Design a protein with these regions (language model features):
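The feature marks the mature, well-folded catalytic cores of soluble enzymes
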Residues: 1-306
Length: 306
């Protein structure tokens, strides 16, 4: 397999979609590792496996409709494998195997079905102290945006997934790219007060547009960096409540086609009427209760150079 992913929106040819089967029991509050799951367990609204399966089936059907080759990881018993993005990610023709949080290490073995098709020298394992998850890595052609957390309480912050060591390592293995760090606000138990991954506060769509939640960044200058790059006229800003429901976490099949949650009325209408995009609406509300949405569920392997 010849990997090729340079951005978030070029025409998708091959992707890994997470696995909804055998997710195991509902975690306790202590076992949750993101604020949205914490809230779902606290309020007894954590999703049922059959609902997760149904929603992912709808997403898969849209991918297949557009001729995308869909890979699935092996099913591991009693293991939540919905969010493929965090296990690995592709930059150009390289796949980086994430050093994910210890609670999720078992998930990586299920991706052998993909790794076995990739040349060994294109698979990169990070040094032990370099932590990164794919949700914090957003591609925009020659630019790689990386969501970071560099504060002293990093070891205590369950929702801090990517550190400065990973940022340095990625720069080393992709020397032709421009890397831009964006520091995120974090909170372990309040999903309205912190950002789990960069793709929960920022996402490029189309050729030159972006969806942004400005208050997700620890430093206001990071928001202005994005605004300067894309242009205010090309940015759709979401509210705190829309961020909570993960409006930035849409997934592009091409520069013209984006998959979005069906309840994102304001965003979906804007993308269609103002940006002229085709919006494929799917139900994904139950999955969102576990702290991720559409982009989180995918690991793109091949996109065209369009």
């Amino acid at each position: 397999m010849q990997l090729n992913v340079k951005n978030e929106t070029s025409t998708l040819k091959a992707v890994v979609l997470g696995q909804p089967g055998s997710i195991g029991k509902v975690p306790t509050l202590e076992e949750t590792y993101d604020a949205k799951s914490y809230e779902s367990v606290l309020h007894n609204v954590y999703p049922h496996e059959e609902d997760i399966f149904r929603e992912m089936k709808c997403f898969e059907s849209i991918l297949l409709k557009y001729g995308v080759q869909v890979y699935r990881p092996w099913t591991l018993e009693n293991c939540n494998q919905v969010f493929a993005r965090d296990v690995g990610f592709v930059i150009d023709d390289k796949i980086i195997v994430s050093n994910i949080i210890p609670n999720r290490e078992d998930e990586k073995e299920a991706y052998e079905v993909v790794y076995n098709q990739i040349a060994y020298h294109k698979i990169f394992n990070l040094p032990e102290k370099a932590h990164v998850e794919g949700g914090d890595v957003v591609l925009y052609n020659n630019i790689v945006f990386v969501g970071l957390y560099t504060q002293p309480d990093y070891p205590q912050m369950k929702t801090a997934r990517t550190n400065k060591y990973a940022f340095a390592f990625l720069k080393e293995i992709c020397p032709g790219k421009i890397f831009i760090p964006l520091e995120l606000k974090k909170h372990n138990t309040d999903p309205r007060a912190g950002i789990l991954h960069l793709d929960c506060t920022f996402m490029p769509v189309g050729k030159s547009h972006a969806i942004i939640y400005r208050d997700g960044f620890m430093h206001s200058q990071d928001y202005h960096t994005l605004l300067d790059l894309f242009g205010r006229e090309n940015v759709f800003e979401i509210t705190r409540e829309e961020m909570y429901h993960m409006h930035t976490n849409v997934f592009s099949i091409s520069p013209r086609v984006v998959v979005s949650e069906k309840s994102f009325t304001r965003l979906n209408t804007f993308m269609e009427e103002e940006w002229g995009m085709t919006v494929e609406r799917v139900p994904y509300h139950e999955i969102s209760k576990m702290g991720g949405l559409l982009r989180c569920s995918t690991l793109p392997l091949i996109r065209e150079n369009d």
